[in-house]
Amino acid sequence: MRLNPEEVSWVIQQEIEKYHEDLSLKFESAGRVLYVGDGIARVWGLDDVMMSELVEFPDGTLGIVLNLEIDNVGVIILGSDRNIREQDIVKRTGKIASVPVGEGMLGRVINALGQPIDGKGAIETKEFRAIESSAPGVVQRKPVNEPVQTGIKAIDSMIPIGRGQRELIIGDRQTGKTTVILDTIINQKNTGVCCIYVAIGQKSSTIAQVVKILEEHDAMKYTIIVAATASDPAALQYVAPYSATALGEHFMYNGKHVICFYDDLSKHAQAYREIALLLRRPPGREAYPGDIFYLHSRLLERSAKLSTELGGGSLTAVPVIETQANDVTTYIPTNVISITDGQIYLESDLFYAGVRPAINVGISASRVGGKAQSKAMKKVAASLRLDLAQYRELAAFAQFGSEMDKTTQAQLVRGERMIEVLKQDKFKPISLSKQVMIIFTGTKGFLDDLPLPFIKNFENEFYLFMDENHPHISNSIEQSLDLDQKTMEQLNEAVTKFKSDFKLRYQI
């Protein structure tokens, strides 16, 4: 039988047209799973896939492409790998990982993918934002010039934080790092600032405790908690801080002010090390991959104070690093110290000595926050850091028991009282005006002749006295953020009167 080529082509053409009529063919780029385990998969056949692209497994689980190799791609699985098998088909989505953003997220506890895990139902929001985005450029930024009031006397007076700054909290475990964060969140009530707390690799019970504390202080309504617990895969712990930053960027680009707390980046680095080793990336120092610095720098560089043209919003980053045996010279702590604009160092020796918050002022620093500090605080706390530094030096010398002159004794007395003034109960942030007034009292020498056990009572009763008898002084400081000569004289008179009454009452 002899075939006519024209007839054959006509028949083929008819068959093709029939397909066009019956169904619209969809071409998908797909590959097959070569290996799966420990939260990662190696996939063959995805030749045209992009770096960081989302891919989908047959059970609906998503993964992010993290390694592009000659014959396969390495994928981190965002969820359980229990139902994924070798030879399963993996499809490209053509999308980069993104999370839902918007006002509807406030007050909720979500996972690293933006899905609610607090049992309060679905989140109503239609906006999404890519978890990875480039940091604002130099022209888009503005110098840090507005303060973030933490409500903690030691921080607001000596290590001030500005909106758009990156300030590291560093210290051993159980030294009060999370307490400093919770105090700061509670103090943002009625300021219009949104707070995002990212829990990386923490116990679920710890996160539940954080939620309970914030609810008790009515702080959840302006807070988002992003939880990647210790039981979550390393991939979700790796993604969580980037998702939280995307949430914060949405508010920042809409002209709002956001503080993002990353608790903590040590566990984040460990999760990334685990992923990198499983993907067979070459290990470097302490077995971390070569791009571990870039992991944190690209995250923290997204924090900024935007220019007025872009709305003037800000994203302040407060990362946490956990040290071992007070050693800040190891790899990850030194990396993050060099990326951030300052650090608050919490010391276990101070914590156990009863100095809480256990801030070591000598090692702590704020490289840009001083420009944002209020004028009132600058005036009263100017000599505070020097007083404490001199006290620490003299206290070490005084242990030898040698005789000291009156000036040295006066410096020791002043230092002891200022340390007592800077102690603070947890979850009780103090307003700017009260901080200014009590630090003024200490630095001007009003407390020098009071016995140490009475300092706490003096402080508490002094606040009540000022609220009842001199509310105009507090109002003046809160409104102008300054302490003019007239207000300073009024404050001086008020402190003098209160002190004489206090000494009579306690027969000092």
From Swiss-Prot:
The record marks 364 as: Required for activity. Its EC number is 7.1.2.2. SUPFAM superfamilies: C-terminal domain of alpha and beta subunits of F1 ATP synthase, N-terminal domain of alpha and beta subunits of F1 ATP synthase, P-loop containing nucleoside triphosphate hydrolases. One of its GO terms (cellular component) is plasma membrane. Keywords: ATP synthesis, ATP-binding, Cell membrane, CF(1), Hydrogen ion transport, Ion transport, Membrane, Nucleotide-binding, Translocase, Transport. ATP binds at residues 171-178. It is found in: Cell membrane. It is a peripheral membrane protein. F-type ATPases have 2 components, CF(1) - the catalytic core - and CF(0) - the membrane proton channel. CF(1) has five subunits: alpha(3), beta(3), gamma(1), delta(1), epsilon(1). CF(0) has three main subunits: a(1), b(2) and c(9-12). The alpha and beta chains form an alternating ring which encloses part of the gamma chain. CF(1) is attached to CF(0) by a central stalk formed by the gamma and epsilon chains, while a peripheral stalk is formed by the delta and b chains. Produces ATP from ADP in the presence of a proton gradient across the membrane. The alpha chain is a regulatory subunit. This is ATP synthase subunit alpha. It comes from Protochlamydia amoebophila (strain UWE25).
